[in-house]
Every structure is written in structure tokens, then in C-alpha cells.
Amino acid sequence: MRRVTRSQISRRSLLLSPAAALSCSPPKATGFRGYCFVGNQVSRSVAVVDLTKFRVRKQIPLDAAPSAVLPHPKVTKVYVLMPDAGTVAEIDGMSMAVSRRVRAGNQAVAMQMSAGKDALWVLYRDPASLVELPLDSLRPGRRIRLASPPDSFHLTSEGAAGRQAAVASVQHRSLTLVSLTTGATERTISAGAEPSFVIFRKDGRQVLSGSRPERSLNIFDAASGKTVVRLPLPVEPRNFCVSSDGGELFISGPGMDAVVIVFPYSTEIWQTVLAGRAPGVMTLTEAPSYLLVANPETNSLTVLDESQKLVALVQVGEQPSQLILTPDRQYVLVLNEKSGDMAVIRTYSLRVPRLGTMGARFRSAPVFTMIGVGEKPVSAAVVPWV
């Protein structure tokens, strides 16, 4: 063993070392002043999680199983879709109870907030229609009737060329474009392949449709309905997410342990990157720019940086099914369907290396806490206290 001389370790360096360690320590975690409302499918309930204390405040019973939860854009309320009952329920975060409910059909499929954030649009299969629910009244407004049974839909975003909805029908292998201003069907596009999902490009000028049976992404011109390009995919397109500027589309699904990255504006596939075993749902963070990918088969979360390199792995609960970012971007909330809990991950822990891992290619990031929320959580929304 080499002898340590006085010149190598000084009294000054010993005094300064605790200060250096403190300067490198992570900032103290603070809660988010708001609630996370978690829809539980099997237990037919909504769990209200206090994000300042990270515990469930209340379980709100529902009349039917929920499938989606959306936040109100201005106040502490959420909207819960119960598709088999054809009902949308409004839950008030202050009273922690159902404040209003509306039923505009027998069987619903999905719902989305309008670009103006003043109404919900609910897609119904029975009867086949797209129904507007203004938030102020929560009563059925305009009803746009559809010629074929719908399976999914998407609305143009704010700032797009027009206010439209694209509705996909698997049975008829078609995409129907309707005007949200006039309520008229503008055109029906023959998709050729079964449309598994449909989205507008951010400017509203093109419609993108993924087909699981044919493993393809089909891009159509919204104005004419003509096919722009058909892009073959190495996966069945089941999950997707879009960057905030609309310049990147990320697709995952069965067939390959990878995520496909598409450039919608240049209508080309940029690259395919490995993203853990059987990649599922995804979300994006900013500053730093990370792609978070759920891996249900391994009960984990894969984190890729902007150069698509693996930077972290996080072990979460069983079968992670949805990823939600808190509005302050401080936490990632992971819903785990099988284990019935929600993993809370600090985004800071994903970007700051821990001691002893500086030379590692990637690291294992910790879970901040786990919260039991109910049987089969399938959707959630975070709203601040107002």
C-alpha cells in the first residue's frame, strides 16, 4: 500500500470536501400543487392523488368503467369517459365528487378537447356520430353524423389551416374528414389498409394513418384526399406520440423492440432505434429532451436522449400503460395496469448522474415513490389547484 504524504491531503482540502459534496447534491424534491385523477377500469372508480403529499385523498365511485380522463384547461376539474355507458362525467377537484354527467349516445369510443379549449368532442359508435359538449353547459351541442362505424379520431390543432376532424373506420377502411365549423362531411378517403390510428399533421395540411395489419404509415393530402406516400414500417403501429413542434412522430408496436422515428413534413422515416423489450406508450420531456418509453413486458421505463442513446432504465410497477408529465415537468407519473399503482419519477433523476456512474453508458434511475391507486388504472390527468 502506498504511503500518503502530507502534500497529497491538506487540511484545506478536507475542510472543502463537504462543501463540494453539498454543491453536487440534487435539489430538494417539492410536490406539485395539484391533483392527479386516475381512472381505474376494473374497480370503476377515480382515485384522487394529492401531489403535494403523494397519497390518495379519495376514491370516487363511477357508474361504469372509465377509459379516458381529460383535464379542464382552466379550473380544477376533469372529464371521465365511460364508453360502455356512453357517458361523460365531470369531477370537481374541490368537492372531490361527480358534479355533472351527460349521455349523448349508447356506446362511445374516445374524446378529445377542442383546439379552443372550450368544448369536448366525443366520438360515438352507437349511433355513429361526433358530438360536441361545450364545457360551460356540458350538454350535447352539434352532432355530426357518420356514414360508417368509427374507431378513432383526431382534431386539428390550434393554428391549423381549418377546424376539422379526421375519423377512422376499420370496417370500411376509410378516413372521413368533417368540418367542425359547418358540421358537413368534406370528403371520405379510401385508406386501402385498415386504419389503426389517424392524426393530422400540426398544420392540418396532411392526414397520417397507421395500419397494423399492413405495417405501414399512409400520408394523405387533407385538401384533395390524394395519397402522398405510403411508408412501410418494421412494426405494427399501435402507439404513437408527436413532438411539440410537430416535426417528429414516434411509433411503436409489435414486431420489433424498437421505436420508429418519422419526419412528417418531409414524409420520410428518419431512423429506427432500439428502446427496450416490446416498447409501448411514449412521451417526451424538454430541457433536456428525452424520449420516455414504457416496456410492459419488463415492467420498466427506457429513457433515450435527443441523439437516441440510452441514458437510463427505471424499474416501475407491473405493465406500465400510460405516462403523464406534471405541468411543472418535475415528475413523470407511470400508471401500472397489472399492479394497480402509480410510479412517481423525478425528471431530475433522469438527467443527473449519481456518484460512481459517471463512466457508465447508462444507469438505473430511482423511483421517487409508488402509490396504490386501484384495480387496472388506464388513464389519468393532472390539474393544478386554482
Where are the predicted features?
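N-terminal secretory signal peptides and thylakoid transit peptides that target proteins
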Residues: 1-19
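Predominantly soluble domains enriched in secretory-pathway, periplasmic, or organellar proteins
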Residues: 9, 18-386
